[in-house]
UniProtKB/Swiss-Prot annotation:
One term under GO cellular component: endoplasmic reticulum membrane
Free-text comment on the cofactor: Binds 1 copper ion per dimer.
Cellular compartment(s): Endoplasmic reticulum membrane
UniProt KW keywords: ATP-binding, Copper, Endoplasmic reticulum, Ethylene signaling pathway, Kinase, Membrane, Metal-binding, Nucleotide-binding, Phosphoprotein, Receptor, Transferase, Transmembrane, Transmembrane helix, Two-component regulatory system
Matching InterPro entries: CheY-like_superfamily, ETR, GAF, GAF-like_dom_sf, HisK_dim/P_sf, Sig_transdc_resp-reg_receiver
GO molecular function ontology, one term from the record: metal ion binding
Protein name from the UniProt record: Ethylene receptor 4
Classification via SUPFAM superfamilies: CheY-like, GAF domain-like, Homodimeric domain of signal transducing histidine kinase
Record-linked PROSITE patterns: RESPONSE_REGULATORY (PS50110)
Domain GAF: 184-344
Catalytic activity: ATP + protein L-histidine = ADP + protein N-phospho-L-histidine
Length: 777
């Protein structure tokens, strides 16, 4: 190429010189011919510049691609080619400059050198092409191989993505089955088989489960086969028709492994799974855990249950037998099987929760029925208790009223022992009435009153009652009092008297006088903190025993003869008293009602007995506050109401008679009425004959009573000439005590009631209330 260029350049120069010679030789030059030659020269110069620019740009491009790729194998050939290109470009560039300076010697020398170097470089490039072209061909072959491999990888990647999508779809279907209500284990297994068949293009799929009642057999419960006539799959529930032994080696191998196992096509499990289908290709199997929720007994210990598994058998089509099961396919099977296990576990848990909910609902119904029966029994018991208390309260109220008249006779003719007996009877009756009021009105809350009372009088009356009970039971009685006991103390005398009577009654019930002599002892003395305690269960108190406090020890004991103790120790002998108790029943003192009372009174109580069973005792220690100053017990004032005309309405004959006697004792002229209606009829017929009306009506005690005291009072105020009548009504003990909101006072004002007297009606209480009413009105 350089030689051709040189020849062209020399020819152009010769032509240019001859033309000039012709023009300068004499004669006129052809201006048109000179213009064409000049145009050609300009065209050659431009072409040389463009060719030079093109040649010089090629090495730059090669350098750029060399930085982007590894050209170590063709480095020599590339260098030769780059040198050849650069020299060719330089030759064309110098040739372009010769058109302007054709006779420049340096330019001609440079052009000659460039052409010589270009010739050498072209020769070297031609030689290097002998090795460059085969390498280039090998690179092309490798590129085609890589392209084919990339195509196969792309195709495999598409298959993997499709299978992953199918796996995701299978997981979503199983999740939907889990969220379905209610989930079914067989439905979950069917969904698993269908989704795996769709994802992997299976020829057949089978689900084996342990046979019910046959632990050594597996039953084919589901079988999925591909029908050749259409694209749909046929899912059959086989049932118990096809079985396989649980001790088969393939079955044992699958059961023992957590991952999928590839089986031989001629194995027993594979042959049994391809029932009714064409011969299959590669076979894989995996176990699916079936959760059995532990059943808990009453103690909370779980029952140990043996693990149970189902087997999922997957069969590929025969034309895929060469490929077999890939690791990715087995991973897909593992993922779907794990999801199926989760779904089965969820279904088992939900099934167990439903059964537990049903059992809990049944138990709740039973508990509600039991609660209803218990509430009915409680209401019945309360009704019976209230009826019994109401039935007992009226006789007790009558006794209290009669005893109040005996305590305040018109002439003081009673002997001291008679007065002591009457006071003891009055205290016992008041205690019984108060206890019944507590049972009816305030059964839960216990309160202790702290007010001054005569300790000597209480002890004398308690000893009197204890001696009377001992003599009635045929036992002896002995009491011992300390002279240093204070006269007046502050406390709840009713609670103390109740505790003492209970101690006496408990020991007397344990005394069998027919088997031998018994003697009851009663002792009261002051004790101190350092006194020896008789019960290990009792924790000593640490009160401050100053001059304002005193600690009193009450001890009631029972002593028996040797023959009585021996007879009581025989196991075959039963006590003859129906109320007798055993030694274990002595503990009732420390429980419930009495224990609360003792604690509220800052005291302690315990029982003790000797090893031979001859003697038993109950000890009570109470702390009292001493009453400061001298207290004078003045007898209550009994007024005399001269000829006060009173109408008494009471629906109980005994109470009516006692209240009438009390009113007559107060100097009243009394007419009685057995009911509220009779009272109203008497008032309507003789309006001006009565000055005061006493109402003691209780419709709860008498079911036939039509009206209570408040209703009768309202009817009385509705009468024409009854505005001047004074009305006093007798109410139960707890009505006024529990009236915190003033509802009873408001009801009395609305009904026109002038006074209230608390039951039981006694001579001092009724006299004081009548005096107050007469003074206020």
């Amino acid at each position: 190429m350089a030689m051709v260029t040189a020849r062209q350049f020399l020819a152009s120069a010769a032509e240019l010189g001859s033309g000039r010679r012709r023009c300068g030789g004499g004669g006129a030059c052809d201006m048109r011919e000179d213009g064409g030659v000049e145009a050609l020269m300009q065209c050659q110069r431009v072409s040389n510049l463009l060719i030079a620019a093109s040649f010089l740009s090629i090495p730059l491009e090669l350098f750029y691609f060399a930085t982007c790729a590894d050209l170590s194998e063709v480095k020599c050939a590339v260098l030769h080619f780059c040198a050849f290109i650069v020299l060719c470009g330089a030759t064309h560039l110098l040739a372009a400059f010769t058109h302007a300076h054709p006779h420049s010697a340096p330019l001609l020398r440079a052009l000659t050198a460039a052409k010589v170097l270009a010739a050498v470089a072209s020769s070297a490039a031609a030689v290097s092409l002998l090795t460059f072209i085969p390498k280039l061909l090998r690179i092309k072959v490798r590129e085609s191989l890589l392209r084919d491999k990339a195509s196969r990888l792309h195709r495999d990647l598409g298959l993997v993505r499709r299978r992953e999508e199918a796996t995701s779809r299978a997981v979503r279907e199983l999740t939907g089955r889990i969220r379905a209500s209610p989930p079914d284990a067989h439905a979950i297994l069917r969904t698993t088989a269908l989704q795996l068949a769709d994802a992997l293009g299976l020829h057949a799929c089978a689900v084996w489960m342990p046979a019910a009642g046959r632990p050594h057999d597996l039953v084919l419960v589901h079988h999925l086969t591909s029908r050749p006539d259409d694209a749909a799959d046929l899912l059959l529930e086989v049932g118990d028709a096809c079985t396989v032994a649980a001790d088969d080696p393939d079955v044992v191998d699958v059961m023992a492994s957590k991952v999928a196992k590839v089986l031989e096509p001629d194995s027993a499990l594979a042959m049994a799974s391809s029932v009714g289908a064409a011969p299959a290709g590669a076979v894989a199997a995996i176990r699916i855990p079936i959760l059995r929720v532990s059943i808990y007994d009453g103690g909370g210990t779980p029952e140990v249950t043996e693990a149970s598994y189902a087997i999922l058998v997957l069969l590929l089509p025969p034309h895929d037998a060469a490929g077999g099961w890939s690791s990715h396919d087995l991973e897909i099977v593992q993922v779907v099987a794990d999801q199926a296990a989760v779904a089965l576990s969820h279904a088992a848990v939900l099934e167990e929760s439903r059964s537990m909910r049903d059992r809990f609902a049944e138990q709740h119904r039973a508990l509600m029925q039991a609660k209803h029966r218990a509430a009915m029994a409680t209401r019945a018991f309360s009704s019976i208790q209230s009826a019994m208390c109401h039935a007992m309260r009226r006789p007790v109220h009558s006794i209290v009223g009669l005893v109040s008249m005996l305590q305040h006779p018109e002439a003081d003719t009673m002997r001291p022992e008679q007065r002591l007996a009457v006071d003891a009877i009055a205290r016992t009756s008041n205690l019984l009435s108060a206890l019944m009021d507590e049972v009816i009105v305030n059964r839960q809350h216990l309160s202790v009153q702290r007010k001054p009372f005569s300790l000597h009088a209480l002890i004398k009356e308690a000893i009197s009652v204890a001696g009377c009970l001992s003599h009635c039971g045929g036992a002896g009685f002995l009491h011992q009092l300390e002279c240093a006991l204070p006269e007046w103390v502050v406390g709840d005398e009713r609670r103390v008297f109740h505790l003492l009577l209970d101690m006496v009654g408990t020991l007397l019930n344990r005394c069998n006088t027919e088997s031998g002599a018994c003697r009851l002892s009663f002792s009261i003395r002051i004790c101190n903190v350092g006194e020896e305690r008789y019960s290990l269960d009792w924790i000593p108190m640490r009160p401050t025993f100053s001059g304002c406090n005193v600690c009193v020890k009450f001890k009631v004991g029972i002593g028996r003869s040797r023959s009585c103790a021996i007879e009581r120790s025989l196991p075959c002998e039963l006590p003859r008293r129906s109320a007798a108790t055993t030694s274990s029943q002595m503990g009732h003192i420390f429980s419930g009602y009495f224990n609360k009372i003792v604690q509220m009174m800052n005291g302690n109580m315990w029982s003790a007995s000797d090893s031979e069973g001859v003697g038993e005792s109950v000890t009570l220690i109470l702390q009292f506050k001493l009453q400061q100053g001298h207290v004078e017990a003045s007898p209550p004032y009994i007024p005399h109401l001269n000829g006060l005309r009173v109408l008494l309405a009471d629906d109980d004959a005994m109470n009516r008679g006692v209240t009438k006697k009390i009113l007559e004792r107060l100097g009243c002229q009394v007419m009685s009425a057995p009911s509220g209606a009779h009272c109203l009829s008497l008032l309507a017929s003789a309006e001006a004959s009565f000055q005061l009306v006493v109402l003691d009506l209780d419709d709860r005690a008498v079911p036939s009573a039509a009206m209570d005291g408040f209703e009768v009072a309202l009817r009385i105020r509705e009468l024409r000439y009854s505005c001047w009548l004074l009305i006093v009504i007798a109410v139960a003990a707890g009505v006024v005590a529990t009236d915190d909101g003033g509802a009873v006072q408001e009801l009395c004002q609305r009904a026109g009631i002038n006074g209230l007297v608390q039951k039981p009606v006694t001579l001092p209480a009724l006299g004081a209330q009548l005096c107050r009413v007469l003074q206020d009105n």
